Amino acid sequence: MATIVQCLSSCATLESQFKVLSLKGISCSSPSSSFSNRRGASATLSSSLSFSQSVSQCVAFSTGNLWVQKPMRQLIVCEAAAPTKKADSAAKRARQAEKRRVYNKSKKSEARTRMKKVLEALEGLKKKTDAQADEIVTVEKLIGEAYSAIDKAVKVKALHKNTGARRKSRLARRKKAVEIHHGWYVPDAAAAAPSEAVPMAA
């Protein structure tokens, strides 16, 4: 906006200079003065024309419209690359699900087999009349293998952790019951006897 106002004021100054030049040319009568006036007028005219030329380079007037040249702008276009990762297909998901199902089934089956061996050994030891205390060591080894199988099944999430804890507790209770049956383990009297009621103070 400031550039347009400056150009308009320069055009008005140029018009006034043209009027002064025409008046000076009419009033002068002597050859020497007319020559000097013509020389000065030509200098003024040339300076005015040079100014008007510089103005016309900046702003062009055409049929009452003001045209201002805008600077050129460079545009940078970036193309987004397509994703390289291929989407999983339904067939692939089915294969993975089947693979996990077979793996989890094997872990659960192993834990179940180990537990069955422990329970059978404890049942046979309980029915045996002349059982010795050293025979429980073999059962304890089987219990350790069963615990390991249960922990592996829980680790791969084939079994819930609470389910694994219940199964291990079941084996421990069965072992303790056999030891109590043969007299190899005597529970504490305080734990076996019911707790006596504490009399209230009068």
From Swiss-Prot:
<keyword id="KW-0694">RNA-binding</keyword>
<dbReference type="InterPro" id="IPR036510">
    <property type="entry name" value="Ribosomal_bS20_sf"/>
</dbReference>
<feature type="region of interest" description="Disordered">
    <location>
        <begin position="89"/>
        <end position="110"/>
    </location>
</feature>
<dbReference type="GO" id="GO:0003735">
    <property type="term" value="F:structural constituent of ribosome"/>
</dbReference>
<comment type="function">
    <text>Binds directly to 16S ribosomal RNA.</text>
</comment>
<keyword id="KW-0809">Transit peptide</keyword>
<protein>
    <recommendedName>
        <fullName>Small ribosomal subunit protein bS20c</fullName>
    </recommendedName>
</protein>
<dbReference type="GO" id="GO:0006412">
    <property type="term" value="P:translation"/>
</dbReference>
<dbReference type="Pfam" id="PF01649">
    <property type="entry name" value="Ribosomal_S20p"/>
</dbReference>
<keyword id="KW-0689">Ribosomal protein</keyword>
<keyword id="KW-0934">Plastid</keyword>
<feature type="transit peptide" description="Chloroplast">
    <location>
        <begin position="1"/>
        <end position="79"/>
    </location>
</feature>
<dbReference type="GO" id="GO:0019843">
    <property type="term" value="F:rRNA binding"/>
</dbReference>
<comment type="similarity">
    <text>Belongs to the bacterial ribosomal protein bS20 family.</text>
</comment>
<dbReference type="GO" id="GO:1990904">
    <property type="term" value="C:ribonucleoprotein complex"/>
</dbReference>
<dbReference type="GO" id="GO:0009570">
    <property type="term" value="C:chloroplast stroma"/>
</dbReference>
<comment type="subunit">
    <text>Part of the 30S ribosomal subunit.</text>
</comment>
<dbReference type="GO" id="GO:0009507">
    <property type="term" value="C:chloroplast"/>
</dbReference>
<keyword id="KW-0150">Chloroplast</keyword>
<keyword id="KW-0687">Ribonucleoprotein</keyword>
<dbReference type="GO" id="GO:0005840">
    <property type="term" value="C:ribosome"/>
</dbReference>
<dbReference type="GO" id="GO:0005829">
    <property type="term" value="C:cytosol"/>
</dbReference>
<keyword id="KW-0699">rRNA-binding</keyword>
<dbReference type="InterPro" id="IPR002583">
    <property type="entry name" value="Ribosomal_bS20"/>
</dbReference>
<dbReference type="GO" id="GO:0003729">
    <property type="term" value="F:mRNA binding"/>
</dbReference>
<dbReference type="GO" id="GO:0009941">
    <property type="term" value="C:chloroplast envelope"/>
</dbReference>
